[in-house]
Amino acid sequence: MQTGKAISIPSILKVGNGTLNKIGEYLKSEELTSVVIFMGNGLIDMFGDTIMKSLTDAGITVLEYSELDTVEIDDIITLAFDIPNKAKAVVSVGGGKVIDAGKYAAFLRNLPFISVPTSSSSDGFSSASASLLVHGKRTSVPAKLAHGIIVDTQVIRTAPEKFIYSGIGDMVSKITALYDWIFEEAHGAGVVNDFAVMVAKKAVNSFVRTPYESIKDELFLKELVDSLAMSGIANEIAGSSAPTSGSEHLISHELDKILEHPQLHGIQVGIATYIMSVVQNHRYVRVCTVLKRTGFFDYAATLGMRNQEFLDQIDMA
């Protein structure tokens, strides 16, 4: 008798100070003894020695080791089928581009994917989809949830603050996304998975209630990353991005089309979340408090974005 739905979750989840030094140990524990590694632009100089030493000390064979700066689907398909047959895993170290590219390459080759984000700009490092260029258009394509997520909070801390603010914006967006999903079900436009709702709610509530003095506090960064990772699990349970992506994301996608220089995804989403929380009359005080207290609004004010641009896109979205 079928008793429930099978879901995937990461076998490795390590978030903390200094985890990059232990990447070899983590892979060895899963018997992932031969890997290919893709890194974002400039990251070999920054983290290459640390990663290679950890892998060598653990007896991990590195079959390929290169920087990667493409999300063109044709390039990634070629890349995927150039991966040596001896590879037991694909490791991506860096931001959204290299994470998405490595994730999709691993999916095509049915290999475990190890996600090692160097910033906390969104929940993409934990999601089972990849944002790629298909015929020149950004498209979300199916991939596979990461087998492992390894996040060094010291690395996250030293990244530019804009990436932390982007992660904050993406995290609070779960508030309006969940409202939209439940609203849709109530009006016959969808079906809510209650367990996915619970996980997504726990993720965002844990984050917004975290005490901190600075957004670079160890506890704050760990809660941000943990909550973003949980968001990816909520999507896996739901079988869609509904628990974490609603009207606020649609507004951001429309902005991407019209702005000459779009801002980071999480920045646009965070502003759109505040607007939609007011429209929904749902937890807008909490959203405003988080975005004010963290300095998100102050940072966004330096970017020259106009309120009307967001308001104009509500109808388009």
Predicted regions and their residues:
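ATP/NTP phosphate-donor binding region
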Residues: M1-A89
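Active-site segments that bind and position negatively charged phosphate/pyrophosphate groups
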Residues: F195-M305
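Internal helix-turn-beta structural module
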Residues: N307-A317
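Short glycine/serine/threonine-rich phosphate/pyrophosphate-binding segments
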Residues: I44-F47, K97-K103, S122-F125, T244, ...
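A short, small-residue-rich loop immediately preceding and capping a beta-strand
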Residues: I83-A105, R109-S120
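A glycine/threonine-rich phosphate-anchoring loop and its flanking beta-alpha core
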Residues: F107-A203
